[in-house]
Design a protein with these regions (language model features):
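Short acidic, Gly/Ser-rich segments with clustered Asp/Glu that frequently serve as metal-coordination loops
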Residues: 34-37
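Active-site-adjacent betaalpha module
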Residues: 4-8, 17-25, 52-60, 77-203
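Short, well-ordered beta-to-alpha junction loops that form the rim of enzyme active sites
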Residues: 69-70, 129
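A short alpha/beta connector and helix-capping loop motif
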Residues: 39-57, 61-66
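Glycine-rich, proline-tolerant flexible connector loops at the mouths of alpha/beta enzymes
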Residues: 73-75
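Short beta-strand segments at enzyme active-site cores
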Residues: 28-29, 63-69, 152
Length: 203
């Protein structure tokens, strides 16, 4: 059962928790040197949770895929620029795939989209930067493609903006926009438990 209808106000929306479970991949979005720094909301906590999650994924044989954003030549945030590179603290392991996108959603890179389709995965663990831009766009794009999406708490973050500080923006998406409607927002511990369950099924 891919969709189960529930009443939501005056409309009807699908319940994301009723989508089928499948094999997982971790999608690490835009953790690049130019934006992965102490300006982010709860930066140190973000790093701790990310490292724990990535270590558990690798130990569970859950594939980790990185996606980097390219703002174009001359922007200072493009191929060849130091700020474009992945932050050392969250660097990929040898052999892990890295895709480059030019728009907010990871699915704007058609090779990324084709790779997921080829692997026949249907559960994506989406983490990284920024909650209100590329993370949100990727979650909505994945939902439209009928993926089941997991958002581990504290594994995405963002900056202050002209309307909300980083903490409020984080809460707006993680506690209001995404839960139940577009994604399952669960603890890092529960996410790791699910990954370990996948490893047991694969043995």
């Amino acid at each position: 059962l891919w969709y189960a209808e529930i009443k939501y106000g005056t409309g009807v929306v699908p319940r994301v928790e009723d989508r089928k479970w499948g094999h997982m991949k971790v999608i690490v979005v835009d953790v690049q040197k130019g934006i992965t720094d102490a300006r982010l909301y709860n930066y140190e906590g973000f790093l701790v949770r990310m490292k724990r999650l990535l270590t558990a994924a690798r130990q569970s044989n859950v594939e980790v895929i990185y996606v980097k954003h390219d703002d174009g030549p001359g922007s200072g945030f493009s191929v060849g620029d130091e700020d474009f590179e992945i932050a050392d603290a969250l660097a990929p392991m040898e052999g892990e795939k890295i895709f480059i996108k030019e728009y907010n959603s990871c699915f704007s890179n058609k090779k990324f989209e084709a790779y997921l389709e080829e692997c026949e995965e249907n559960t994506l663990i989406v983490v990284g930067l920024q909650s209100d831009f590329c993370i949100n766009a990727t979650i909505l794009s994945a939902f439209d493609r009928e993926y089941r999406i997991i958002v581990p708490k504290g594994c995405n973050t963002t900056f202050d903006n002209d309307y909300m500080d980083g903490a409020t923006t984080y809460r707006f998406y993680n506690e209001y926009v995404w839960p139940d409607r577009f994604a399952q927002c669960i603890s890092v511990e529960d996410t790791i438990h699910l990954m370990l369950g996948q490893r047991r099924l694969a043995i």
